[in-house]
Amino acid sequence: MYAVVASGGKQHRVAVGDVVDVELLSGEPGAAVNLPALLLVDGESVTHDADALASVAVTAEVVGVVKGPKIRIHKFKNKTGYHKRQGHRQKLTRLKVTGIETGKA
C-alpha cells in the first residue's frame, strides 16, 4: 500500500517505512507530522475521491533537518566586467513515514 501526499507545494509517493525529504517544516526531531493524502493505492483499489481520502491519515516522524543540493547562481553584465557568483542550499526536513491508516474498520 502506498499514498501520494502533498507537502510544501510538492507531491511525494510514500509507503510505510520510507524516508522522504520535504520542504522545511517546524518541529523538533521525533515529533509526529500528519500529511494530507491525495491518492491511495491499496493492492488493486485506487482511491482519489476527496471525501474518501478525508478518512485517510498518513503519519510521519521528523528525523531531522538536512541541506539540499548546492545551487550556483552566476550573474553577468556584458562589457562592464560585472560578475556576481552566489550559492544557495535549501533546508529540508527529513521525514520517516510511520503509518498509513484508512478509515475502514
Curated annotation (Swiss-Prot):
RNA-binding listed as a keyword: yes
GO CC terms in record: cytoplasm; ribonucleoprotein complex; ribosome
Keywords associated with the record: Ribonucleoprotein, Ribosomal protein, RNA-binding, rRNA-binding
Keyword Secreted tagged: no
GO process annotations (BP): translation
InterPro entries in alphabetical order: bL21-like (IPR028909), bL21-like_sf (IPR036164), Ribosomal_bL21 (IPR001787), Ribosomal_bL21_CS (IPR018258)
SUPFAM superfamilies (alphabetical): L21p-like (SSF141091)
Signal peptide location: none
HAMAP family noted in UniProt: Ribosomal_bL21 (MF_01363)
Functional note: This protein binds to 23S rRNA in the presence of protein L20.
Assembly notes: Part of the 50S ribosomal subunit. Contacts protein L20.
Family: Belongs to the bacterial ribosomal protein bL21 family.
NCBIfam families with a match to the protein in the record: L21
Designated name of the protein: Large ribosomal subunit protein bL21
Organism: Frankia casuarinae (strain DSM 45818 / CECT 9043 / HFP020203 / CcI3)
Gene: rplU
